[in-house]
Amino acid sequence: MAMNFVTFNQDYSYLAVATSKGFQIFTTEPFAKSYEAKEGNIAVIEMLFSTSLVALILSPRRLQIQNTKRQCTICELTFPTTVLAVKLNRKRLVIVLEDQIYLYDIQTMKLLSTIDTSPNPNAICALAPSSENCYMAYPLPQKAPAAASTPAHAPPGTTHVSPTTGDVLIFDAVKLEAINVIEAHRSPLALIALNSDGTLLATASDKGTIIRIFSVPDGHKLYQFRRGSMPSRIYSMSFNTTSTLLCVSSSTETVHIFKLAQQGPSSDGSSSHSPPSRDHGSPPNTYGYAHEEDEAVGDAGSDSSLRKHNGTLMGMIRRTSQNVGGAVAARMGGYLPKGVSEMWEPARDFAWIKLPRSNPGPGGNTGAGPLRSVVAMSSNTPQVMVVTSDGNFYVFNIDLSKGGEGTLTKQYSVVDSTDRLGYTTEY
């Protein structure tokens, strides 16, 4: 039996695990198995809050909605291509294919809309759990220019596909209309997440160094955080239920917890709160925002070009900022170009967690690459829950007043020691 997929439900009270021989559902507080089905090779599973309704992908193109309490199938749908992801709330069911999104009324299972997208092989899509702010977010479809030509390296007869955009389209899933486009990153998107109220959007690009948070639906940038200086694949992002913290896991095997400041944003719409600065496993970076290639302005993205200007404008800004209070820096930022003023932004984690590496049992594979993970915050306690691709469920305590490194308090296994995650964590 191999693990195929793992995800938390919308309020993080349950954990669902899809395997090659059925699926399992666990409560998270306390951790205990709640339900198990031992039939079917389940590629993807999604729950609807704490109800008995689950959505299952049984074969690449076949979706089944089941009632686990009655142990019956409610409906079954077949799609033209592989189903990559499923999203649910109390009003809508979203099915993500590589180049289409199907939107259903979850009460009647009536197809409401079919949305064409740019190729989206990583199923980058988020649906707010909220019924009031029932927003869906996905990469803005790219339109190839009329004069676009296929690169020389492309095989004859193939259609060239441009990289995924760094812009996010906000779609009202009740009114069935696009309402905004958020210019999130210059690089292609890697992951997006909406909070429980549908009022905040977190975004990460494929570089994985900068995490941004925008208000929804108006798209104002509220916060910008730095995960690290070295590129990394972002695996999971999750707000806590009160939207005061954001957890982020990546291929560095460090989970970062970012604190959303209670005070107002700075003059350019970004957070002016500065949590303790930490950069785990990455060289120190004193240049902040402009150091990252993804966010560079002109040639300022190059570390060497910044060092050349040390002692001039860049050096003066760095030395001055060490002696200037946050309020003064915010006022000065209003007179500087955006790329320069954003160097004062905090962009560091408030707390962090280092994931342990477990010893694989018989048939385990230590060479399976980075330890992938899905993260969530407990609704009742200051704890971070992490499920890893080697089948472990961890609970860490964090200090909400001081931050710092989290402490491992509980550890469980969601599968046998020989099982590993072979398909994907929820992206």
Curated annotation (Swiss-Prot):
Bias kind Low complexity: ranges: 265-275
Chief place where the protein resides: membrane
Keywords linked to the UniProt accession: Autophagy, Endosome, Membrane, Protein transport, Repeat, Transport, Vacuole, WD repeat
SMART domains with a match to the protein in the record: WD40 (SM00320)
Segments for region (Disordered): 262-290
Subunit details: Component of the PI(3,5)P2 regulatory complex.
Role summary: The PI(3,5)P2 regulatory complex regulates both the synthesis and turnover of phosphatidylinositol 3,5-bisphosphate (PtdIns(3,5)P2). Necessary for proper vacuole morphology. Plays an important role in osmotically-induced vacuole fragmentation. Required for cytoplasm to vacuole transport (Cvt) vesicle formation, pexophagy and starvation-induced autophagy. Involved in correct atg9 trafficking to the pre-autophagosomal structure. Might also be involved in premeiotic DNA replication.
Protein name: Autophagy-related protein 18
Species in which this protein is naturally found: Penicillium rubens (strain ATCC 28089 / DSM 1075 / NRRL 1951 / Wisconsin 54-1255) (Penicillium chrysogenum)
Taxon lineage: Eukaryota, Fungi, Dikarya, Ascomycota, Pezizomycotina
Name of the encoding gene: atg18
